[in-house]
């Protein structure tokens, strides 16, 4: 392929750009050989003429086709060069928001500066077990590759994370470690990862600082080794640190800070415990104020310091050590602020003895002040003969002080790392490890010094190792494919490394110059010029004699030699170290001890020891002078070699972190900065190595599918695809060097795939043009015929329309004439009527106007008269008030005068009666006051009487005067005339009004009738409309109400279902956790057994029960205390891994544990007391003779008790009858008055129930007491050595005493009825005397035992009262203290405090009462249950005794007669002996195979076990029932544990366990479970035992088996899902193939073909369904199983779809929809579509539809939002970002469209989780499913070997 073909018109190229580095352009003209320029058009439509270098003939880089842009692996690009790499990273980062990209073996990680939801547990589980190229690039994929290669190759691995400061190295390393912790067995973060994460705050505090590029820059490198055992579980970790930047302790550039710990300590200086540190603000110290700003925006140093302290505590650093660490750090700050004064001579200096900073430094480190002051300013020189003490200049002292500060900090740093390693260390043997290296990338600044030199030197070594590894992998790939290997020219940086570290290299010359006493940086630089000026990698700057340039692999770096020697020496004088060694603080002395580090002072300026606290140190070297010998460069070179040795011994994996911009803006890409880092981190070198060979590689099958369109038809006849591919390539590419045929792949040179894509596109374009031509011609013909037919039709219709329109016109003209005639007539009539009505109206209004005017005049005159009347009245009243006010004033003056006189008289009288007033002050005052009041009232009465008489006379005179005036006015003649006129006017007015009113009445009547009629019609119409509206409203309301009620009911139902599902899920999760804990316990027990078998110290065996599972099941004979202790011990051994359980359950368990502990203590005390009593009685009483009691004593005792109870019963009956009569009388009265007999009937029912309960309780008490007495007698008769007879009953869980009177009566009855006993005949003939003596003796013993018991009770009661007394005393003391505190408060506070105290007291009392009620209720239930059990036992014992007695008598009568048993009907019970139980469990459970029962009844073992349980119930043997059920459950667990991957066995025991559970419910006797039973089945119910608790245990066991069944099925299906659902072509020829990169040929991928098709999944599910149906599993459970499996298929498929770019295409959506439809069809064919499995697939269905929908316009966005309701916003956006067209004819999804989708989905409250939880399990429900079989119809096959079972 010639250059002209490549550079043709419309070809896109890359040209350099100063702003964007590279810019895209398109050729507007073909290029020809010899052209000096190219005609280009830029993306902004600008025309550009691009010149070509004629000498080099270097054309611009070609751009890859759009189909290759955005690939996961950069090596999949056809054209591999810098602009292609940069553009691909930019597109992925900005448009798709993908921060990870592969570049061969390198993972490129771009820091997004934003939290992304791609690091959760679900993502970890999705990447776990996947091949590296199958999923999208991720740090988890690299970690999984390392973990997989470690497990497969058994070789240690390393992950090398590098990059600039702020590029995200630490975060990447953190997520890699989290992945290892999760897949390595520490997913709960409770072991190693938690400690490693806890070390992060510490290492950030002491090793991170603010720089100009990063606020939290790590100033050291670390290598963390995560150790694994043989099972590849994490067992420990170890940390090594490198390149600590010590110089930052004493110097910081502008806008930078020292290490964070200094500022954190200053921020916390105000705390009380840090007062002795004498710290203030960070601005006050020299070492923390050089950079300027001491704070970081958004960072709280005090809060970070608290996190640092917590991390120290978590890692086990003691408080004393923490305080010592902080003292050392504070002392460094004080040391930096010491004031050093130069002397006049300039060769010496001194420090003031009163220097506060030096005093604080010495005090904090515990050293001598005078010695440190002296040796800071002096140094000791040692020669062969003498020792000199020499002064130092100011600069030398400052350098020595800084070196000491750096040395102290470096030693402290090492000590902290050592303790972190101790916390991460494990005693177990490490099998392999994975190391994570977090180290600096290549650095270059404006001024580069010794630190940058060390960093770049380390990166040269790492790049060399990287290049060799890449070269090796390329060679292995070529050899594997059997391609001829040709050497590839790649950059070898060994000459640069030799320049630095070889003999007489830069480091060697630097060490040599450091040995010279007066060596300088200038001399060293001159030596470099002289020695290495000829080297290609060394250059001398033109304008400087103190700088030099090294050509590194990434770039040229200019280093300034100033400070190299001083930093390389880093001299710390031994005298200062010796002072620190003599510190009185152990930690300070330990830091500088010789056996710690032989060369502690020369840790590198930016590189400390390579392995801190990891390797053992060598013995210290004796030095001749007083300063240490090894230089920083030497140590750094040694540590670097050790690191390289470690890395070379492992398989490396590379992560290169890129910083996209310096402003830390989220998802902002700066091309310049990115290119710099890509060049520096070796990514472009990887690209160059790949491009030098055959970077594009295609499998034959993929190549054939992609480029089959280029194959000729005759070549398709060949069936050999390899031969077809060879033929096609030989025809298309003429140069044979451009491709190579490998064993399984075809290798192409760079650009060849792009050329093939061009040919393919041309072929498609030609075919498209041909198709378009043909289709367009056909469309035009069809269009012509359609137009012709349409024209004829239009003509016909138009002509008809015109004729119709003419006829219509004529008809309208005629109608218009008629309308005009009638209209004109109507208009004339209306005009006449209008004129007539107007005249009438005008007349009426005129007449009314005149009338109103006359009326208004008359009205005005009348109103004037009224006004005059009221005015005159008002004037008269005002005159009267004026006269009355004057009279009142005169009266007041007179009264005042009179009062003064009276006052004067009273005063005179008061002076004369002074003595009497003193004697009777009170009475006199009262009398005087009363007398005064009476006088005042009399005077007031007189005054009022006088005023009344005066007022009366005045009013009389005024009335007379007014009468006279009225008479005078009436006599005047003018007034009579006005009155007459007024009367006439009034009469005329009334007549006029009468006429008007009559007329108006007539008009109103007429109009009223008319309006009423209209109104009536309107009302009727309105009423009709209202009725219609009301009817519609009622209908709508009814519909709305029904809809609302239905919606509310549905919402409530959904809520209840959801709550039920959550509760069930929570419970089943607890069951699952319990089973996991049980499994963990078994593992730990096995491990402990192995440990105990090893020689050495062994622990004594515990006295715990040997039964493994008794504690798991309720039993009468099993102690709950022991179970709880076992559970607590298990929790302690497991390490509280599941402590995150529900808090309510946890609190209940705690409470139960406390109760059981108290109960255990009480029982222990009682047991000890009982043992003491027994021992005392054994010593006190002599042995007794045998006692033989007649069993007929029980009959006598029963007769006596029966008589007593009968008498009591008669009394109670009489009382009850009287009560019934009284209630009946009252009820009749109430019925007669109210008529409600319900209360009477209810009361009678209650009385009946109470009566029945009383009778039952009486019988129970009688039977129990009888059994107690008989049991005591038998025990006394059977035990010869029994020392005494206990007064307590021996029934388990019972503490009731035997009644004394009952015991005495019982033994009297024995004495009376036992007159024929022969054993006591030696006393008298009848034996009565001996019998009486024996009875009295027994009674005496009973009384003695009872007396002792009472004394013990009395002692216990006394102790209890003492304890109560002490508690009351404590409470009184507390109350007194509270009272004293209350007195100090204000009154309001006292009231409030008192109320609070009362509330708290009442709350405590309420809680105590509730607890007491719970205990009493619990005790009551327990006693009732025991009473029932004992009653049944007593009845069965009596029946057995009677049966035995009758059998004994019958045997005595018929001793010689043989009786044959008749054959009885099988009652559905199976009898077995106790010793056959183990054989039964072995044959029926442990050794049973499901194939043995293939032709029998399903769930036969469950039926057999129930028949055995029923016989044990029939014989009332509770121990047998308990033992059988416990053994069965344990046997099932053992079988499932043994066959934990056998689906058939698990399904078999799930069906049998559920059937046994159903049988226990069906035959329990509960009416709720007996509704579907037949009469025969009801006869098979249990009679004696309530096995409800065992039903719960079986339910839990069923849940565990179900979860194991799902786990097995998921394990079988999961490897098939991705291949069958996403990769397999269900519709042939639909999907295309795209080129793949290096990761698709990763070493972790298996060579075999593991592809599956959808038929494999359906076939496997058919097998599952058949097995479950054959074994009789309930249909409801089968539905739940397939619902869970379909959810797992949905989750795995969707998660892979969200993490794989290669499957997000239209064709995959089509294939996926087809596969889902096939699964739905399978569900319908098996009648499983009602299980809800289809609903679980809804997210996957919507994802498939999303891949097929249009993605361009706003309407498309709305359609997507309305359709994808089951997908979250993140999932929708992720799929759109991943969507990749398979050919160039399909457009990509634009960024604007994705933003539109995001804007429309903002209102959704979606979870932040991207992936579905594939581990989620729906809660299982076991609905009750009774069996129709009867127990007597079941036959046991002989293959079960159960001949020892007897049918009953």
UniProtKB/Swiss-Prot annotation:
Changing residue 316 to V: In DIAR2; uncertain significance. The modification Phosphoserine is found at residue 1446. Changing residue 517 to L: In PFIC10; uncertain significance. Residues 1166-1179 have a biased composition (Basic and acidic residues). Residues 69-761 form the Myosin motor domain. Residues 899-1266, 1341-1471 form a coiled coil. Keywords: Acetylation, Actin-binding, ATP-binding, Calmodulin-binding, Coiled coil, Cytoplasm, Disease variant, Intrahepatic cholestasis, Motor protein, Myosin, Nucleotide-binding, Phosphoprotein, Protein transport, Repeat, Transport. Residues 8-60 form the Myosin N-terminal SH3-like domain. Changing residue 488 to T: In PFIC10; uncertain significance. Residues 1526-1803 form the Dilute domain. CDD domains: Myo5b_CBD, MYSc_Myo5. This is Unconventional myosin-Vb.
């Amino acid at each position: 392929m010639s250059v002209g073909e490549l550079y043709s018109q419309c070809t896109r190229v890359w040209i350099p750009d100063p702003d964007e580095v590279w810019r895209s352009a398109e050729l507007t003209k073909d290029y020809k050989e010899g052209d000096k320029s190219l005609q280009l058009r830029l993306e902004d439509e600008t025309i550009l003429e691009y010149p070509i270098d004629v000498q080099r003939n270097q054309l611009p880089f070609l751009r890859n086709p759009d189909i290759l842009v955005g690939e996961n692996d950069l090596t999949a690009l056809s054209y591999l060069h810098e602009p292609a790499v940069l553009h691909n990273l930019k597109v992925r980062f900005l448009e798709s928001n993908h921060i990870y990209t592969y570049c061969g073996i390198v993972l490129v990680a771009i820091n997004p500066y934003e939290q992304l939801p791609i690091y959760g547990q679900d993502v970890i589980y999705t990447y776990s077990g996947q091949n590296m190229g199958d999923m999208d690039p991720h740090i988890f994929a690299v970690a999984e590759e390392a973990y997989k290669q470690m497990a497969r190759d058994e070789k240690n691995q390393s992950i090398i994370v590098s990059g600039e400061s702020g590029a995200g190295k630490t975060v990447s390393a953190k997520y890699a470690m989290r992945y290892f912790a999760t897949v390595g067995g520490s997913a709960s973060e409770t072991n190693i990862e938690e400690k490693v994460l806890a070390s992060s705050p510490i290492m950030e505090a002491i090793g991170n600082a603010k720089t100009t590029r990063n606020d939290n820059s790590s100033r050291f490198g670390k290598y963390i080794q995560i150790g694994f055992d043989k099972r590849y579980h994490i067992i420990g970790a170890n940390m090594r640190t490198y390149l600590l930047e010590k110089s930052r302790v004493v110097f910081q550039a502008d806008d930078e800070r020292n290490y964070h710990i200094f500022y954190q300590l200053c921020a916390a200086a105000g705390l009380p415990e840090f007062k002795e540190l004498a710290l203030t603000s960070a601005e006050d110290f020299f070492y923390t104020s050089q950079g300027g700003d001491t704070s970081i925006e958004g960072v709280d140093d005090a809060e970070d310091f608290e996190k640092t302290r917590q991390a120290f505590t978590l890692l086990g650093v003691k408080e004393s050590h923490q305080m010592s660490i902080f003292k050392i750090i504070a002392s460094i700050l004080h040391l930096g602020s010491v004031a050093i004064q130069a002397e006049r001579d300039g060769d010496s200096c001194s420090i003031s003895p009163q220097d506060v900073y030096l005093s604080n430094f010495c005090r904090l480190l515990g050293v001598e002040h005078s010695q440190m002051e002296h040796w800071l300013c002096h140094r000791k020189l040692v020669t062969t003969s003498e020792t000199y003490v020499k002064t130092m200049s100011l600069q030398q002292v400052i350098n020595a002080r800084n070196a000491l500060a750096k040395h102290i900090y470096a030693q402290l740093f090492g000590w902290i790392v050592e303790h972190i390693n101790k916390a991460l260390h494990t005693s177990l043997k490490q099998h392999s490890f994975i190391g994570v290296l977090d180290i600096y990338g290549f650095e270059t600044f404006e001024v580069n010094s010794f630190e940058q030199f060390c960093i770049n030197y380390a990166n040269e070594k790492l790049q060399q190792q990287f290049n060799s590894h890449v070269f090796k992998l390329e060679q292995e790939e070529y050899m594997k494919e059997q391609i001829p290997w040709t050497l590839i020219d790649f950059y070898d940086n060994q000459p640069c490394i030799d320049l630095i570290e070889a003999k007489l290299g830069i480091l060697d010359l630097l060490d040599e110059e450091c040995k010279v006493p007066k060596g300088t940086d200038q001399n060293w630089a001159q030596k470099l010029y002289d020695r290495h000026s000829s080297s290609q990698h060394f250059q001398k700057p033109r304008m400087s004699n103190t700088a030099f340039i090294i050509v590194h692999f990434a770039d040229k770096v200019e280093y300034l030699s100033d400070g190299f020697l001083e930093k390389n020496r880093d001299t710390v004088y031994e005298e200062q170290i010796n002072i620190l060694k003599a510190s009185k603080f152990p930690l300070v002395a330990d830091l500088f001890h010789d056996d710690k580090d032989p060369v502690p002072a020369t840790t590198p300026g930016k590189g400390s020891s390579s392995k801190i606290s990891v390797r053992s140190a060598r013995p210290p070297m004796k030095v001749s002078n007083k300063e240490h010998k090894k230089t920083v460069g030497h140590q750094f070179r040694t540590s670097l070699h050790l690191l390289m040795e470690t890395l070379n011994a492992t398989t490396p994996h590379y992560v290169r972190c890129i910083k996209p911009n310096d402003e830390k803006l989220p998802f902002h890409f700066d091309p310049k900065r990115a290119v710099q880092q890509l060049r520096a981190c070796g990514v472009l070198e990887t690209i160059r190595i790949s491009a030098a060979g055959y970077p594009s590689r295609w499998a034959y099958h993929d190549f054939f599918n992609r480029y089959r369109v280029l194959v000729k038809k005759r070549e398709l006849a060949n069936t050999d695809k390899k031969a077809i591919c060879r033929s096609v390539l030989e025809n298309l590419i003429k140069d044979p060097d451009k491709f190579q045929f490998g064993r399984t792949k075809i290798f192409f040179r760079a650009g060849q795939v792009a050329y093939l894509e061009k040919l393919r596109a041309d072929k498609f374009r030609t075919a498209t043009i041909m198709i378009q031509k043909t289709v367009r011609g056909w469309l035009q013909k069809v269009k012509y015929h359609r137009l012709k037919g349409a024209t004829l039709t239009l003509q016909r219709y138009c002509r008809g329309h015109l004729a119709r329109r003419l006829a219509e016109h004529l008809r309208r003209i005629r109608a218009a004439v008629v309308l005009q005639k009638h209209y004109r007539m109507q208009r004339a009539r209306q005009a006449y009527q209008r004129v007539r009505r107007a005249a009438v109206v005008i007349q009426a209004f005129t007449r009314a106007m005149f009338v109103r005017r006359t009326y208004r005049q008359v009205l005005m005159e009348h109103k004037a008269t009224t006004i005059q009347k009221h005015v005159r009245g008002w004037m008269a009243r005002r005159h009267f008030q004026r006269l009355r006010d004057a009279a009142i004033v005169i009266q007041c003056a007179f009264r005042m005068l009179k009062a003064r006189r009276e006052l004067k008289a009273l005063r005179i009288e008061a002076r004369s009666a002074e003595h009497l007033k003193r004697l009777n002050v009170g009475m006199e005052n009262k009398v005087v006051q009363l007398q005064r009041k009476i006088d005042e009232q009399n005077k007031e009465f007189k005054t009022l009487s006088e005023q009344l008489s005066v007022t009366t006379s005045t009013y009389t005179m005024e009335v007379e005067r007014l009468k006279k005036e009225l008479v005078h006015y009436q006599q005047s003649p003018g007034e009579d005339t006005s009155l007459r006129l007024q009367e006439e006017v009034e009469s005329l007015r009334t007549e006029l009004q009468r006429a008007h009113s009559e007329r108006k009445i007539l008009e109103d009547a007429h109009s009223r009738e008319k309006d009423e009629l209209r109104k009536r019609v309107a009302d009727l119409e309105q009423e009709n409309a209202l009725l219609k509206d009301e009817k519609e409203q009622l209908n709508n309301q009814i519909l709305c109400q029904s809809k609302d009620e239905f919606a509310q009911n549905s919402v409530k139902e959904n809520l209840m279902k959801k709550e039920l599902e959550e509760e069930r899920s929570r419970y089943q999760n607890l069951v699952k956790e319990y089973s996991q804990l049980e499994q963990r316990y078994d593992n730990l027990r096995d491990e402990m057994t192995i440990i105990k078998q090893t020689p050495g110290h062994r622990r004594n065996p515990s006295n715990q029960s040997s039964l493994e599972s008794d504690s798991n099941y309720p039993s009468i004979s099993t102690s709950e205390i022991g179970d709880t202790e076992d559970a607590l011990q298990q929790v302690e051994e497991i390490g509280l891994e599941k402590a995150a359980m529900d808090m309510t359950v946890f609190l209940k368990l705690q409470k139960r544990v406390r109760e059981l502990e108290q109960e255990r203590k009480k029982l222990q005390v009682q047991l000890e007391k009982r043992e003491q009593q027994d021992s005392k009685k054994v010593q006190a009483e002599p042995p007794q003779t045998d006692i033989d009691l007649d069993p007929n004593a029980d009959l006598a005792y029963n007769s006596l008790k029966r008589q007593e109870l009968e008498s009591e019963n008669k009394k109670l009956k009489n009382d009850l009858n009287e009560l019934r009569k009284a209630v009946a009388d009252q009820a009749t009265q109430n019925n007669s008055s109210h008529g409600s007999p319900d209360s009477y009937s209810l009361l009678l029912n209650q009385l009946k129930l109470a009566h029945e309960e009383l009778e039952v309780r009486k019988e129970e008490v009688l039977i129990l007491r009888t059994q107690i007495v008989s049991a005591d007698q038998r025990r006394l008769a059977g035990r010869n050595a029994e020392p005494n007879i206990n007064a307590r009953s021996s029934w388990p869980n019972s503490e009731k005493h035997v009644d004394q009177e009952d015991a005495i009566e019982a033994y009297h009855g024995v004495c009376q009825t036992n007159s024929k006993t022969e054993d006591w005949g030696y006393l008298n003939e009848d034996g009565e005397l001996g019998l009486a003596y024996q009875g009295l003796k027994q009674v005496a013993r009973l009384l003695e035992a009872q007396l002792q018991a009472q004394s013990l009770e009395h002692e216990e009661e006394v102790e209890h009262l003492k304890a109560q007394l002490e508690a009351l005393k404590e409470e009184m003391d507390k109350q007194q203290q509270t009272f004293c505190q209350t007195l100090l408060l204000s009154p309001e506070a006292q009231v409030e405090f008192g109320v609070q105290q009362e509330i708290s007291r009442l709350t405590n009392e309420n809680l105590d009462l509730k607890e007491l009620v719970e205990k009493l209720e619990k005790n009551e239930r327990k006693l009732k249950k025991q009473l029932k059990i004992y009653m049944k036992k007593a009845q069965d014992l009596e029946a057995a005794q009677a049966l035995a007695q009758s059998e004994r008598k019958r045997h005595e009568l018929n001793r010689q007669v043989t009786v044959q048993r008749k054959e009885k009907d099988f009652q559905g019970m199976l009898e077995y002996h106790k010793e056959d139980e183990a054989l039964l469990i072995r044959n029926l459970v442990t050794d049973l195979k499901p194939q043995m029962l293939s032709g029998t009844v399903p769930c036969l073992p469950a039926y057999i076990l129930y028949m055995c349980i029923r016989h044990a119930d029939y014989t009332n043997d509770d121990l047998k029932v308990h033992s059988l059920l416990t053994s069965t459950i344990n046997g099932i667990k053992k079988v499932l544990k043994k066959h934990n991957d056998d689906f058939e066995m698990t399904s078999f025991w799930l069906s049998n366990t559920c059937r046994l559970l159903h049988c226990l419910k069906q035959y329990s006797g509960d009416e709720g479970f007996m509704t579907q039973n037949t009469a025969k089945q009801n006869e098979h119910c249990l009679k004696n035992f309530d096995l409800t608790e065992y039903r719960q245990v079986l339910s839990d066991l069923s849940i565990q088996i179900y979860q194991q069944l799902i786990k097995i099925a998921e394990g079988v299906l999961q490897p098939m899902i991705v291949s069958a659902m996403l990769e397999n072509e269900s519709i042939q020829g639909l999907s295309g193939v795209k080129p793949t990169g290096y990761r698709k040929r990763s070493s972790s991928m298996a060579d075999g073909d593991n592809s599956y098709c959808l038929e494999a999944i359906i076939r496997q599910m058919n097998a599952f369904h058949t097995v479950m149906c054959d074994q009789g599993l309930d249909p409801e459970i089968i539905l739940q199983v397939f619902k869970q499996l379909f959810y797992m298929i949905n989750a795995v498929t969707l998660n892979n779809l969200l993490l794989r770019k290669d499957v997000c295409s239209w064709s995959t959506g089509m294939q996926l929809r087809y596969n889902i439809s096939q699964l739905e069809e399978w569900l319908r064919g098996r009648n499983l579509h009602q299980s809800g499995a289809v609903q679980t697939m809804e997210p996957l269905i919507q994802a498939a539809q999303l891949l097929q929908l249009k993605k361009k316009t706003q309407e498309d966005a709305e359609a997507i939002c309305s359709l994808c309701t089951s997908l979250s916003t993140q999932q929708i956006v992720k799929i759109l970002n991943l969507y990749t067209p398979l050919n160039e004819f399909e457009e990509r999804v634009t960024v604007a469209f994705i933003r539109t989708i995001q804007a429309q989905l903002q209102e959704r409250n979606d979870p932040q989780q991207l992936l579905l939880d594939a581990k989620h399990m729906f809660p299982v429900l076991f609905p009750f499913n009774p069996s129709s079989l009867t127990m007597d119809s079941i036959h046991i096959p002989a293959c079960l070997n159960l001949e020892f079972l007897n049918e009953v």
